[in-house]
A protein has these predicted regions:
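Post-transcriptional modification and biogenesis factors for structured RNAs
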Residues: 1-162
Length: 162
């Protein structure tokens, strides 16, 4: 039988996903949907531009309401990551910082190991238009730059802060 089986409990665990200043409710909803597909349910929002909660996020979540229902709102990155032991920042460009750079695969392997030890982890994403600025990466002392490889140079946010 194809489709989602809503009678089964949702999986939980894995890293927290932290969206910093997300710009559109639809993007929050699609992030929640991707999280649900991967068995993640800890969504943290830092100062969403269009406020929270969002009807547009619910519409875009396509059944991942349980992720949105648990989503928590934070006033700062520091508050959003305060309970996490390891934080990885996703960025598509060089940051010229003294931070370890990991491939997404290596970061996932590390997180899996830390989570198995009971150490809370999170992945930090910046605003859609500009990405994470260096100040957001410096503020969390535990933050390692997890450099992603976009499918096309056209898909990265503009260079503004580096």
């Amino acid at each position: 039988m194809a489709g989602t089986d809503h009678s089964r409990p949702a999986a939980s665990g894995g890293p927290a996903i932290i969206l910093v200043e997300p710009q559109l409710g639809e993007n929050i909803g699609t992030a929640a949907r991707a999280m649900a597909n991967c068995g993640l349910d800890d969504l943290r929002l830092v100062c969403p531009r269009d406020g929270w909660p969002s009807d547009k996020a619910v519409a875009a979540a396509s059944g991942a309401d349980f992720v949105l229902d648990k989503a928590r709102l934070y006033p700062s990155v520091a508050a959003a990551i305060g309970d996490l032991v390891h934080v990885y920042a996703a960025t598509a460009r060089d940051r010229y910082m003294v931070k370890r750079e990991l491939t997404p695969r290596r970061a996932a392997e590390e997180m899996r190991g830390f989570l198995s030890l009971g150490e809370a982890c999170g992945v930090l994403f910046g605003p859609e238009r500009m990405g994470l600025v260096n100040d957001k990466l410096r503020s969390p002392i535990r933050c390692s730059a997890c450099r992603s490889t976009p499918p096309s140079p056209r898909s990265t946010s503009p260079r503004r802060c580096c």
